[in-house]
């Protein structure tokens, strides 16, 4: 095996690895797939007397290393599907019971007849090349599904020639083949009969994707996961008029370009964008995704839950996958808010949404809106709508009473009111001693001692040298806490609705 600067696939002890070389180095560095245990791999190789070199946590092999022998496509095909050894007709257990096999010979005889094969799976058969000089239309006329994953292909053109000779072929899987020369010929071949293509983890870039869309114009399902694709103005799938399912998961720099085609996902039903550096749902061209029913945007850095409002326009969206823990909220709370914001959802993270769960989610959302109004002192509908554009839809669907917005008041225009059905209320405060008057907002659950401390702070007077009279103009009553027990009363425990608080100096004797 010989490679120049770059990467290529090889097989060592029946384990698929990637080899890299830089410059004129006499060694290849061995890179293992994520699912391979490095320690176990090294032990197995040494046990089989494979001369691996381990240095500083990296694995190397010399150029003359005894790699596993490669096969051609036909060699692998005949090895698996034309195996001629007889099957046992029965098996006898230790107990003496004998079990006869029925029908297996018939199955094997059909496998031996390659012309009747409809599904071919040659996963990890160390296939390096395809003999393009044969007429595969006569050898494999009925093949519908072809899986050549985890082999040693480094050029795509022989596979393309094979597909062009299989008229019944509909599904092609080429996962984990590292194509160092994806477009290897100037010859243009169209494969109009292929409807599903999977090229996950094949080292493809944006130019390769554009070539795929032109070569396979009838694709309905396309998997491009774990490649090196970057969406740009030159990247588009609009040539694939029949495309329904597209997966670009684990393309870590997918959204790193400054701009990308707005019609890149036009007409797609199922879209997977997990782990693609998507930081804001607003980056999705939702106006071109009106047919979308499934969307996976999990494992992306989406932290603003309000950005999900962009998905409300997708009326056909039924299933959403998203990482709830990224919203800096408890997972159960984040789940309720996501459900409430997207009314079309029937499934979230592969779990069905029940009618009761949707009701709970929307009612919880309304409580969050009320809290938002109070905490931010929102004054009117327009101000709230700028923050939460769709709050009124949920309000009307549940026929909820109108929100009581924050009302600003000054000393001049303040009028007395009653503390009722409100969390906070403006109370007029006057200090007889200093001749000052002001308006404070008090919480109905505050203790009188806390209120006295707050008022004393504003008027710069000691708490224990003044008398505080809580009065009501409507009932003509007053209440002056004199004992510790009264001091611990809360505002709603007073025998009347408080509208005034007067502060007197104790030495005046006026209570």
Swiss-Prot record:
A GO term, aspect molecular function: unfolded protein binding
Transmembrane annotation, as ranges: none
Disulfide bonds: none
Biological process terms in GO annotation: microtubule cytoskeleton organization; post-chaperonin tubulin folding pathway; tubulin complex assembly
GO cellular component: cytoplasm; cytosol; microtubule; nucleus; tubulin folding cofactor complex
LRR repeat extents: 116-137, 142-163, 168-190, 191-217, 218-241, 242-264, 267-288, 291-312
Subcellular location: Cytoplasm, Cytoskeleton
SUPFAM superfamilies per UniProt: L domain-like (SSF52058)
Keywords: Chaperone, Cytoplasm, Cytoskeleton, Leucine-rich repeat, Microtubule, Repeat
Domain called LRRCT: residue spans: 325-364
InterPro entries in the record: Leu-rich_rpt, LRR_dom_sf
Domain of life per record: Eukaryota
Subunit (UniProt): Interacts with alp1 and alp11.
PANTHER family listed in its UniProt record: COMMON DPR-INTERACTING PROTEIN-RELATED, LEUCINE RICH REPEAT FAMILY PROTEIN
Role this protein plays: Required for microtubule and spindle assembly. Involved in the proper folding of alpha-tubulin.
Descriptive protein name: Cell polarity protein alp21
The species this protein was found in: Schizosaccharomyces pombe (strain 972 / ATCC 24843) (Fission yeast)
